[in-house]
Amino acid sequence: GFVRQGNAEDLMIGIHERPPIGTSFADQQSDSSLDDGSDVPYPFTSCDDLIALCEKHHMSIADIVWANETAMQSAVQVRSELDNVWRVMRRCVQHGCHTSQTVLPGGLNAPRRAPKMYARLASNSDVLARDKKRADAVLESSDAAWVDLFALAVSEENAGGGRIVTAPTNGAAGIIPAVLHYYWHFVDHANEEGVITFLLTAGAVGYLFKRNASISGAEVGCQGEVGTACSMAAAGLCAVMGGTPQ
């Protein structure tokens, strides 16, 4: 099973049991309805399958995933859940950058660094609170530093018991929000539809890792879960920047 962090607004969307030692989730799921794809119009179990579907039907990865998801639940529900993922990610980054908590819990007396880093990068101007993207020239001062900040803010929220999106795990939870915030704040044509495309595309990559290998740090180490998150984020960013499935 898993342990939930104690937030009153948390929504439990599923429970899985830890596979026996020496096996993976892929071993356990070989006969599951999720994997056989019987209930979706475009089933895929490998990257080759996914690319072939995109080429055959002239669809993007996000289109494929959207069609599959809306075959199992309404389009309104799917969109609502994706919007909520983005909403929680934004609130997490904002809270991580603005919190008054100075030391993380746990007894190690580890200081929170994101608030001071944010104040320094933003020249004490509350850039994240502004709806208009690229609203301040300070955003252009250091793209990489801002991405680092976004990831750090989420990681510190996780360590502090805040509300996060497991993307795909708690340990790697900062990577996808960081890259998605980069898109939102640094790309001129960024919009809500792009966010949805990003999340759908990233989800397809995460599914392939989950099905064929593992996203668990306990199974494949921290770099396994971080590598998965990086691949998901890279795919999402590629999709919204005009890249193709290939």
Predicted regions span which residues?
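C-terminal regulatory domains involved in ligand/effector binding and gene-expression control
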Residues: 1-134
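Generic recognition of cysteine residues
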Residues: 47, 54, 92, 97, ...
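C-terminal catalytic subdomain
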Residues: 210-246
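Accessory "access/gating" subregions that flank catalytic or transport cores
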Residues: 72-221
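Intrinsic-disorder/low-complexity, polar/charged segments
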Residues: 46, 190-191, 244
